[in-house]
């Protein structure tokens, strides 16, 4: 049973926010509006749950009325059967939220072990995420891309913007392993390669303040696949954050735009480091994550000869690899979210 006093606190806060926005009082209206918007689905679940309890209590009272008893006996089993689902939906709505879930994300993909084949797999992963983003109505902007000679990727950094981007893609961080016969393999032997994926919530200006004295900014010529020069101006920008050693590059044609993009990616990486530090300190939070959260953790295997994808964190195996590589990721992501929610619910019940 969910404590009634907790539900009343949420409803009172919601009513306060509604009144504060109506009369323009209470501080930062934009901040109040966001909190109000975040609480709305919770309040809707509370209302549905409380209405069900009220209907059940009313039906049970009707049992004492001879004229209404038959109707009550018909309604009560239906209402009782609906109660567990309503309570579960409310519990999910009450789970602690990751404040970064609503943010855009920075996607980073880099080949691991496997040479040319790993670079080709990195390119396959980028296509997979790009196609998934397209199905979700998200916008993908490439920030940095280094192609290999065979058409793979030595590095890919992209910004993905849209509704719920980080909330759905954050479970993709980790080592992705592929088992297949490489195009360069004449003997038909299956090789194992890997690529590392990192999904970072985009930082906002209020998250990270950077001292200009902590930066070294270099300009250089932008280059494409194979090292050829894309243009003749020194437009590419490389920013080094001296305290951490983080290095960010951006190589669009506008040097001013490159500096803006590189600074945004740097802030995002610093923000991610801070989030990791806080997560490490919260041992209970670490226990509730799907997997260890370590980006060196092998999270998934893509076996092409068998047409199989296995996610090792939740023991999920699907035999529809072509669809998955084509961007059909909802079944995997939904399963990961459900597992994460189940662990949080278990912690709430302790």
Swiss-Prot record:
N5-methylglutamine: residues carrying this PTM: 228
Sample GO molecular function, one term: translation release factor activity, codon specific
InterPro entries cross-referenced by the UniProt entry: PCRF (IPR005139), Pep_chain_release_fac_I (IPR000352), Pep_chain_release_fac_I_sf (IPR045853), Prokaryotic/Mito_RF (IPR050057), RF-1 (IPR004373)
Gene Ontology, cellular component aspect: cytoplasm
Segments of this protein annotated with the region Disordered: 280-304
Keyword Manganese appears in the UniProt entry: no
Pfam family, one: RF-1
Keyword check for Protein biosynthesis: yes
Protein origin, superkingdom: Bacteria
SMART domains referenced in this protein's UniProt entry, alphabetically: PCRF
Keywords, alphabetical: Cytoplasm, Methylation, Protein biosynthesis
Record's subcellular location: Cytoplasm
Post-translational note: Methylated by PrmC. Methylation increases the termination efficiency of RF1.
Family matches, as NCBIfam families: prfA, PRK00591.1
Family: Belongs to the prokaryotic/mitochondrial release factor family.
Protein task: Peptide chain release factor 1 directs the termination of translation in response to the peptide chain termination codons UAG and UAA.
Entry-linked PANTHER family: LD18447P
Name of the protein described by the UniProt record: Peptide chain release factor 1
Organism: Ruegeria sp. (strain TM1040) (Silicibacter sp.)
Gene: prfA
């Amino acid at each position: 049973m969910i404590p009634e006093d907790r539900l009343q606190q949420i409803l009172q806060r919601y009513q306060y926010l509604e009144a504060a926005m109506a009369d323009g009082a209470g501080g930062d209206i934009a901040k109040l509006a966001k909190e109000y918007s975040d609480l709305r689905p919770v309040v809707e679940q509370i209302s549905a749950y409380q209405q069900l309890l009220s209907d059940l209590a009313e039906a049970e009272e009707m049992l004492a009325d001879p004229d209404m008893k038959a109707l009550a006996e018909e309604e009560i089993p239906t209402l009782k059967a609906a109660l567990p689902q309503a309570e579960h939906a409310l519990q999910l709505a009450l789970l602690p939220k990751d404040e970064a879930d609503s943010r855009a994300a920075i996607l980073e993909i880099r080949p691991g072990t496997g040479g040319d084949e790993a670079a080709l797999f990195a390119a396959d992963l980028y296509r997979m995420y790009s196609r998934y983003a397209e199905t979700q109505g998200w916008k993908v902007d490439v920030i940095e891309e280094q192609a290999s000679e065979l058409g793979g990727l030595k590095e890919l950094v992209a910004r993905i913007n849209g509704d719920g981007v980080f909330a759905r893609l954050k479970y993709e961080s980790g080592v992705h392993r592929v088992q297949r016969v490489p195009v360069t393999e004449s003997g038909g032997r299956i090789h194992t390669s890997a690529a590392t994926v990192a999904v970072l919530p985009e930082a906002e200006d209020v998250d990270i303040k950077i001292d200009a004295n902590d930066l070294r900014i270099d300009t250089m010529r932008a280059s494409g696949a194979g090292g050829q020069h894309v243009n003749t101006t020194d437009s590419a920008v490389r920013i080094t954050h001296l305290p951490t050693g983080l290095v960010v590059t951006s190589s669009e044609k506008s040097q001013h735009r490159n500096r803006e993009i590189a600074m945004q990616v740097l802030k995002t990486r610093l923000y991610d480091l801070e989030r990791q530090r806080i997560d490490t300190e919260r041992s209970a939070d670490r226990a509730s994550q799907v997997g260890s959260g370590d980006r060196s953790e092998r999270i998934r295997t893509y076996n092409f000869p068998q047409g199989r994808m296995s996610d090792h964190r939740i023991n999920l195996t699907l035999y529809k690899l072509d669809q998955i590589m084509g961007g059909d990721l909802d079944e995997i992501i939904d399963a990961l979210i459900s597992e994460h929610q189940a662990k949080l619910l278990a912690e709430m019940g302790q």
